[in-house]
């Protein structure tokens, strides 16, 4: 009986779709066939969404359906999808920043109804009605971004609170409780941006390199690049966590910075999969004290449970570059300097292959002052790890690389200049 039902569904999809793909680019046809088979008994609803979508919305609807997680293919109604698309396209017609977007950005970072694993609430219409009034007189995208971000907590009446019932709460769930963690707050902020045609996505890390837990925030696409912003905003690309993000380890997925993609990529968004894969294999009792504390903090405060269908992009290097740029722009105190570090495995320091990517910890007597990661053999030869230190001071530098079984210490002394380079040879 099951086999017969599957064959009937397959036949239904095949015959129905032949006349329904007329306004959809050929590149989606095979993907749509596959999606409708996965939808099983919900295939008529999914097909109705595609069929009833206005001609100018067909490709966007095809994009959503083609890359839709199975959990949504089997449950979402045509009315849910049609309303979501209608309001997304309404913003594209209304706002200059949305009208100017390439399809690839509009489809992937404005049109989607979801971010990670939150409940699929129909938030789009409600949020458009809530937030469109804030951008009515805006013609500049940055002004529009902050016209949403500045009043958002007062509009939705949601504050950060770890007592929330869920980590990845939907806007409706967070607003019912008046609380959310950073994941829930970021979902609200990203959905608010999308509701007025501003491309936005979630970003975050499974675990900071200082092992103090994880974090999630939002990104917006402005001036043809992605910039980060928080629910409690300071400015674009400015927040308390930049120093932590800038010290991410580009060689360890546990410490990468990830951004969410609706369209499948070649890797998953962190959403706990990196945490589970790289940490949960360990016995918690065997973890170093700092890692164990960070792991427990991560479980308490943010998500380590989202599903395997959430895709991501590795944006680690962009955050490292942003942090290094911020250091250059900082005014140094009279007794401070910027120290640049690079680690070599041999004395041939002119060769790119001699460089080693290592963790570099700086100590003054027994107190750890700072840390970071030195450039690898494939990085630009002008790239250094930059740290702010005191002038005319003695330090101990601990260099480690577990993959290559390296652990070495150096004694260094800073001088009286504003900058100083340290090329350390193992």
Regions found by a protein language model. Give the residues of each.
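His-Asp-centered catalytic microenvironments across diverse enzyme cores
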Residues: 161-162, 195, 203-216, 220-381, ...
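Sec-dependent signal peptide recognition
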Residues: 2-7
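C-terminal motif of bacterial Sec signal peptides marking the signal peptidase cleavage site
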Residues: 13-16
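Structured interaction patches on ligand/partner-binding surfaces of diverse proteins
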Residues: 402-426
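Bacterial signal peptide processing site
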Residues: 18-20
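Secondary-structure boundary elements
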Residues: 45-48, 53-178, 265-266, 271-272, ...
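A short, solvent-exposed beta-strand micro-motif common in secreted/extracellular proteins
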Residues: 391-403
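Cysteine-centered nucleophilic/redox motifs
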Residues: 148, 178-203, 218
